[in-house]
A protein has these predicted regions:
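Ligand-binding cleft/hinge of the Venus flytrap
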Residues: 16-19, 30-42, 122-140, 169-172
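Short helix-initiation/N-cap motifs at beta->coil->alpha
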Residues: 44-56, 101-102, 137-151
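Periplasmic-binding protein-like
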Residues: 87-94, 161-162, 169-210, 228-236
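A ligand-binding cleft/hinge motif common to bilobed small-molecule-binding domains
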Residues: 53, 69-78, 127-128, 150-151, ...
Length: 236
């Protein structure tokens, strides 16, 4: 079984940029899915695929890919998704002392210089939910985005909530979470495994994810790897 992910990958999804370790939420989920499908850990091979390339149309180098891919109708035109393995919220992060650190509403962020990673729903959330006056900055990786924030090139970044907790607690001097964006129009944002369009494995992988949700495995892995994320105030 070949599993794809981005290069690099970040905690709490993968630890030490090593997807093979089984440490980090998505690494652990990938091995749990493999186990459900009858693959021993040794039978799992990992490949690295850039985020945007992984959801582009055309043949894939992987059977399934776990890189915090949010399920969307637009993406479904090019790839298949499994059942969702995680329900996600988007959050705004900045550094202490920034003029926008104390914002409590989405409207207060309209004047901010905001940034996000290319092709992500985090970036889309800036455009759709915040709609800032200035064009949002776009970065190839979260590392580039963090650097821009540290250097004062942007006021704030939008990332998924577990990533926000990790960046502000472990990677960004004086990093603070401004708050999480409201979940919006009733459709929850969820991460799913990406598969080739019309892959014969899609149904099996979805059944595996559903079984892991039903038997409590997903909940336990969330507690283990993402619980420290906790909650953040919701921006009104």
């Amino acid at each position: 079984l070949t599993v794809g992910t981005d290069q690099p990958v970040y905690p709490p999804w993968y630890l030490d940029d090593d997807p093979t370790s089984g440490r980090g939420f998505e690494s652990a989920v990938a091995y749990a899915i493999a186990d459900q499908l009858g693959f021993a850990r040794e039978a799992v091979t990992w490949v690295r695929v850039p985020f945007n390339a992984a959801i582009a149309p055309g043949p894939k180098t992987y059977d399934l890919n776990l890189t915090e891919f949010s399920i969307s109708d637009e993406r479904r035109q090019a790839v298949d998704f499994s059942s969702p393995y995680y329900d996600v919220a988007q959050a705004v992060i900045t550094v202490e002392g920034n003029a926008f650190a104390g914002a409590t509403t989405v409207a207060e962020l309209k004047g901010a210089r905001l940034g996000g990673q290319v092709g992500t729903t985090s970036y889309q959330a800036i455009v759709d939910q915040i709609a800032p006056t200035a064009e949002p900055a776009v970065y190839n990786t979260n590392d580039d985005a963090k650097l821009a924030l540290q250097n004062g090139q942007v006021d704030a970044l939008v990332v998924d909530l577990p990533t926000a907790f990790f960046i502000t607690s472990a990677e960004l001097d004086g990093g603070v979470i401004v708050g999480q964006l409201p979940t919006g129009s009733g459709v929850p944002e969820q991460f799913g495994a990406v598969l080739d369009k019309d892959s014969p494995l899609t149904g099996c992988v979805s059944e595996a994810v559903d079984a892991l949700r039903a038997d409590g495995t997903l909940g336990a892995l969330e507690q283990e790897w993402l619980a420290s994320a906790g909650a953040a105030p919701e921006l009104r």
